[in-house]
Amino acid sequence: MAKFGSRNKSPKWISNGCCFLLGAFTALLLLWGLCSFIIPIPNTDPKLNSVATSLRSLNFPKNPAATLPPNLQHDPPDTTFYDDPETSYTMDKPMKNWDEKRKEWLLHHPSFGAAARDKILLVTGSQPKRCHNPIGDHLLLRFFKNKVDYCRLHNYDIIYNNALLHPKMNSYWAKYPVIRAAMMAHPEVEWVWWVDSDAVFTDMEFKLPLKRYKNHNLVVHGWEGLVRLNHSWTGLNAGVFLIRNCQWSLEFMDVWVSMGPQTPEYEKWGERLRETFKDKVLPDSDDQTALAYLIATDNKDTWREKIFLESEYYFEGYWLEIVKTYENISERYDEVERKVEGLRRRHAEKVSEKYGAMREEYLKDNKRRPFITHFTGCQPCNGHHNPAYNANDCWNGMERALNFADNQILRTYGYHRQNLLDKSVSPLPFGYPAA
């Protein structure tokens, strides 16, 4: 029995040894495979190396959802302010806790929240009836096209309203019910940008410096000295303004429009505004003088600290002093492009912002295009322009401004107008303006 046992020891030892070697070999294979992931084996193929380098150089976003477009089909059943029957779009009933309600809506719609901080909605409009000026409707169409062009370049949404939302708030007061309703209809936007129908974007590349206004809720073109010290009603212009979509703005507009024609104190406010602003021409209470009054008399900084009076660029500019400068400005821009080949490069319209940003460094010491040319007093729709202006100056000025702006759009399509008072266009040669 002892001999039988000794004869079977050797095969068992060999079998165990084979299993050990097989296991060790498998472990080595696994270790080698793991190391190949942690410490990549150098690749001698230059083509593969080039591809790998290119992939590593791509800056993929940490949060891919942040780069996706808003989901227009997502509206969960969660209750929001829209489901509250007490919520009113009109200015007759104050809105409360708007910041919290807007924030809650954005939490339920996260695809909108990623870009909400800088999102702008441009709002403009005109009266419900046709224009009495024979060319008025044509001019309003061209003014609107100009705004659509600007919004398309910068990916802004735009609303054109021609409905009177409050029967008593007409003329210059008509815009405030529209702005109030737009804020509620668009909780995804941070800013609402009102631009009068008779205002033209004449620098299509320029973007609002929103960081400059991060601590403010209302931006208006104006000068504090003229408003607070001189008490001039033209110390600011309320035809173009940027207002934040927040509770402060809703409360401020409630105070602002309390001087409007829908209130029983309307006539008294007209008298008070004329007493405060001796240069006021209009007898009635108007929104521009009302805003100036709130700024000039706000000694406790109830509102003033959140209002930014912009005077460093043409947030909106007086047309009479601007329209005669277009040709000289165009020549200055052409001069820069002759020196900088990159600015002359043809490109898709969708990437126009890149070239606008590139141009900025060459405009620091030069006069840039006026951002917005505002035809105050020209009344393109009814034709009843300010008697201080010549009618032809108004109509020719509008034509020049619209064509000056349109040239900036047409260039991307390979055309331009040589004469700002001529509607005909010509193809641009390759390499323009150096060609």
UniProtKB/Swiss-Prot annotation:
Mind telling me which InterPro entries this protein's record contains?
A: Glyco_trans_34, Nucleotide-diphossugar_trans
Keyword check for Cell wall biogenesis/degradation:
yes
Q: Which residues lie on this side of the membrane: Lumenal?
A: 42-435
BP-aspect Gene Ontology terms: cell wall organization
**Keyword hit for Coiled coil:** yes
Going by the UniProt record, its keywords in alphabetical order are:
Cell wall biogenesis/degradation, Coiled coil, Glycoprotein, Glycosyltransferase, Golgi apparatus, Membrane, Signal-anchor, Transferase, Transmembrane, Transmembrane helix
Q: Where does the protein principally reside?
A: Golgi
Please report the record's description of how this protein sits within the membrane: Single-pass type II membrane protein
Q: Which GO terms describe its molecular function?
A: galactosyltransferase activity
Q: What is its EC number?
A: 2.4.1.-
Gene Ontology CC entries for this record: endosome; Golgi membrane; trans-Golgi network
Describe its applied uses: Guar gum also called guaran is a galactomannan extracted from guar seed endosperm. Gums are most commonly used as food additives to provide stiffness and texture, prevent ice crystal formation, maintain crispiness, and retain moisture. They have many other nonfood applications such as dying and printing aids in the textile industry, thickeners for shampoos and conditioners, binders and hardeners for paper, rheological facilitators for concrete, and drilling agents for oil and gas wells.
Extract the coiled-coil ranges from the record: 321-354
What is the annotated localization of this protein? Golgi apparatus membrane
Q: Please give the residues the UniProt entry marks as glycosylated.
A: N230, N328
**What is stated as this protein's family in its record?**
Belongs to the glycosyltransferase 34 family.
Other information: Galactomannan is accumulated only in the endosperm and constitutes more than 90% of this tissue at maturity. Galactomannan is made by the combined actions of two enzymes: mannan synthase (ManS), which makes beta-1,4-linked mannan backbone, and alpha-galactosyltransferase, which adds galactosyl residues to the mannan backbone. The mannose/galactose ratio of guar galactomannan is 2. The degree of galactosyl substitution on the mannan backbone determines the quality of galactomannan as a gum. A mannose/galactose ratio of 4 provides a gum of higher quality than a ratio of 2.
Q: What does this protein do?
A: Galactomannan galactosyltransferase (GMGT) involved in galactomannan biosynthesis in seed endosperm. GMGT specificity is an important factor regulating the distribution and amount of alpha-1,6-galactose (Gal) substitution of the beta-1,4-linked mannan backbone.
Designated name of the protein:
Galactomannan galactosyltransferase 1
Upper classification of the organism:
Eukaryota, Viridiplantae, Streptophyta, Embryophyta, Tracheophyta
